[in-house]
Amino acid sequence: MKFSDYLDVHPDVEEAIKNGEPIVALESTIISHGMPYPKNIETAMMVEETVRSNKAVPATIAIINGRLKVGLTHEEIEFLATNDEVRKVSRRDLAITVSQKHSGSTTVAATMIIAKLAEIAVFATGGIGGVHRGAEKTLDISADLEELANTNVCVVCAGAKAILDIGLTLEYLETKGVPVIGYKTTELPAFYSSESGFDVDYKIDSALEIAEILKTKWSLGVDGGVLVTNPIPVGYELESSIMNEAINQAIIEAEKEHITGKKITPFLLSKVSEITEGK
């Protein structure tokens, strides 16, 4: 069997691919593991509408009953938002979830893999996974980083998730040869905040110039992704002191409850949201 035998591309996305229209891949973990219902489905629909309003076609990616879905119907988004048995799927889980015909929401890594199969080059998400705090003891490093090193997809986000060790995450990306671009910024944003205290590799002020960089990189045969960081607007960001206090409190609670592995990121993000009252 070919990979296309496992792939279901939404007609709108298929038409856009055929016509060479701009397409933005979107992940689905936020729907099933990132937010409570109904905020999860409202956010998913709002993100898709934002893509459409900027004259591109959204392609939310997930796995439903063992099928790789590129572009979801409203009913499929509702299913992901309300079904407790939906798995969180990264690279290691992909083949098993498909083979056993289960349903799963895709992490950054899994979304990149499926986007590449569908020949979609740009993927937007809130923030990437990375090196967790305390990784020198736990070796807890997200598969997102390895995927960025190997898969030819540009990931646009608001930086690494603030719950991570951002300095070590940047070191890992440097080791793997992943360019970190700041869109109109010299500083790496930190998800909830426009500031992290760490510099990006390159500040680029034009989307067209970024597109030229992508085209050149892959034409040269230099495989791997590119991370484009676009800071959260200042009016929506959390003050660093509030953010760090909430994260530290969430980490303490995770340790008390012995939360580890793939459960740690959704737990911390949910706890930070709870502590900051959804800010």
What is each residue range found by the language model?
Residues 1-20:
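N- or domain-start disorder-to-order transition segments that initiate the globular core
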Residues 14-18, 23-24, 53, 113-117, ...:
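Solvent-exposed alpha-helices and their adjacent loops that cap or buttress functional pockets
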Residues 15-28, 36-39, 53-63, 70, ...:
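N-terminal glycine-rich anion-binding loops that anchor highly charged ligand groups
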Residues 24-26, 59-63, 104, 122-127, ...:
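General beta-strand structural signal in soluble alpha/beta enzymes
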Residues 63-64, 68-121:
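Ligand-binding beta-strand-loop-alpha-helix segment within the catalytic cores
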Residues 105-107, 136-149, 153-174, 207-212:
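Active-site glycine-rich loop that binds ribose-phosphate moieties when present
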Residues 194-219:
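Anionic-ligand binding region
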Residues 217, 222-279:
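A C-terminal functional module that forms or caps the active site or interfaces directly
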